Amino acid sequence: MPLSYQHFRKLLLLDNEAGPLEEELPRLADEDLNRRVAEDLNLGNLNVSIPWTHKVGNFTGLYSSSVPVFNPHWKTPSFPNIHLHQDIIKKCEQFVGPLTVNEKRRLKLIMPARFYPNFTKYLPLDKGIKPYYPEHLVNHYFHTRHYLHTLWKAGILYKRVSTHSASFCGSPYSWEQELQHGAESFHQQSSGILSRPSVGSSLQSKHQQSRLGLQSQQGHLARRQQGRSWSIRTRVHPTARRPSGVEPSGSGHNANLASKSASCLYQSTVRTAAYPAVSTSENHSSSGHAVELHNLPPNSARSQSERPVSPCWWLQFRNSKPCSDYCLSHIVNLLEDWGPCAEHGEHHIRIPRTPARVTGGVFLVDKNPHNTAESRLVVDFSQFSRGNYRVSWPKFAVPNLQSLTNLLSSNLCWLSLDVSAAFYHLPLHPAAMPHLLVGSSGLSRYVARLSSNSRIINHQHGTLQNLHDSCSRNLYVSLLLLYKTFGWKLHLYSHPIILGFRKIPMGVGLSPFLLAQFTSAICSVVRRAFPHCLAFSYMDDVVLGAKSVQHLESLFTAVTNFLLSLGIHLNPNKTKRWGYSLNFMGYVIGSWGSLPQDHIRHKIKECFRKLPVHRPIDWKVCQRIVGLLGFAAPFTQCGYPALMPLYACIQSKQAFTFSPTYKAFLCKQYLNLYPVARQRPGLCQVFADATPTGWGLVMGHQRMRGTFSAPLPIHTAELLAACFARSRSGANILGTDNSVVLSRKYTSFPWLLGCAANWILRGTSFVYVPSALNPADDPSRGRLGPCRPLLHLPFRPTTGRTSLYADSPSVPSHLPDRVHFASPLHVAWRPP
């Protein structure tokens, strides 16, 4: 007869009808009993012949591919002009006085952030935009290009202009100006860009002029050089490799004039009329001469001055005869002026050698499950986390639940701030650019590669027949619809482009570490500036606590102004005021302790409602169930040990079958959640110790000892002794010399004992006592002779390694009606 739920509860000592604990509890460590219970509850029978279940409620398992949903009406989020001030350390020091070593070290890490991968694999441009939505290829292509363009305009990306130069928008940092080559550095102006052409540039322009025969253009460019902020950055360069003294591969715009002016030059009268200021040689494809040059006959660069060529794929359709009703020439003829082939950044800098390749693909998804109107760019730089050359990312401390509760469970009033686009605040050094490249090979290549009738193999790239190969009804209809959204930008986005990250990207394991360092340092500064308040952060989630609502509001104003003065962008619409119970990291934290948020409790309820019994569930689904239940496990009676059978099945990659008793047990566990309370400091007066054969307790001046009916493993014996001490004395601070008991992880003990011990020791704090000093050592060995002196062992609750560098003074418990003028806000705060 299988074990009923009622019997199981009694067995686990969850009911009060059990006999004396000293007799009952050691039974639960018995291997034979554990095996029988596992058989009764069907926990160990992992090999089943019935087919596995691969879906439970919203949890999907093996062999299920969730089809991503494309939204043609996605809005690209706007990015404010984010520019974190470079002198952030100086500004913090003005605000709060000298920074601690810890704060300085953390802030230096991100000014600028550096990225040193062991090895970088370059992928062809065709792989720049992933074909993530096969039904909506063209639509997805343009939305992604628009997103990338928005990021470039916001100063978050560099655009590769040539092998050694890049352009960007926004305010430059000093390291983007101090660009050195060899032993000499450039002479900087305030804008960080050379304003005077150097010797090399005039030499080089002569050199190119004689080679190309582009007199008229060269003269025009030479005249314009003086006024441009980004004149040519080449100069006499004495190295053994180039005895001529000229650096032909220079970073300037004219360096590859032959290929560039040829690559995307379009001489229509419309353009010259509409954009007289933009010289034709400036209209080259940023990055893409390597890709687009195939459209030219071999001698075209030389014959440039004799006859106009329009090799731009998009504009070639203007002069060609429509091949059908769905020919792209119909769309190209909709507009007289399609704008420039490439836009130019406000600043140009020299960068390390960057190939015309990408290092990761991008695609779009919903911004989050609650916001499907906006898109989010997913960047796949997973190459740096895989394979033999993977980078081991730095670890950083995240507070566990108990530390978080100790820190934040108080009678404070809370609000949380939302940092908009937090990752994009932290600048990356330009040397990281060659490793973090995204981009696309342009629409023509993208369509040709993905269309089945692609005839791109025969290398007749210049022929008109080949131009019309890409015309199709699908492409025509998609472009017509996109024309309404993007207008003239269709032309801009149809060109190849290569972009590198100027701020830290989300798809690299280094980014969360850097963000955590940054926000924790800023919160540390805020805590010291306002000693009676608490500021705490986890990644981009920043919370402020103060002892009354009025105090909190004035703190909010002061902190917001401080953060804005550093260049940190807050999203005022997403500031949430929580009152006295804070919602943070999935928990509700109040003066009574922490509990999971309501939406998580609701998910758990739904999960149990849909959980089948007597049906083998695929281990991947079990993994997802355990993920959800594991989050709330610390709030249940038996905690993590109750989930051990599920963990075992996941580890062996087998199916798990829920028996009605085990399901009822878990259901009951998760129906009543108990808060995890804040630990209080105190003095340890109860000590426990054990040997494999006996146990001993010391409670004040009272001593007890007992023996086990059979020898037990030492850790099991120590755990039993701790349970006896707790139940006998009721003390919530115990002294023990066993590190496993101290760690409070009872998952490696016999299953039944782990569950029962978790319930008995819930809310107990442990203090480590070295064996030699443990007063319970003698009783555990059966000696009740002269008593060892009781230790004076204080217990201090820990906040983990969340390094509150400056301890905040304790907050008085009374709540004033309003903020007094002698409030800590006015005493401690000095204007920046």
Curated annotation (Swiss-Prot):
GO biological process terms held by the UniProt record: DNA replication; symbiont-mediated suppression of host innate immune response
Annotated region described as Polymerase/reverse transcriptase domain (RT), given as residue ranges: 336-679
Region (Spacer): 178-335
Spans annotated as Disordered: 186-255, 280-305
Region Terminal protein domain (TP), annotated ranges: 1-177
Organism of provenance: Hepatitis B virus genotype D subtype ayw (isolate Australia/AustKW/1991)
Ranges of biased composition (kind: Polar residues): 186-206
Keyword Aminoacyl-tRNA synthetase attached: no
PROSITE patterns: RT_POL
EC number(s) given by UniProt: 2.7.7.7, 2.7.7.49, 3.1.26.4
Gene: P
Protein name: Protein P
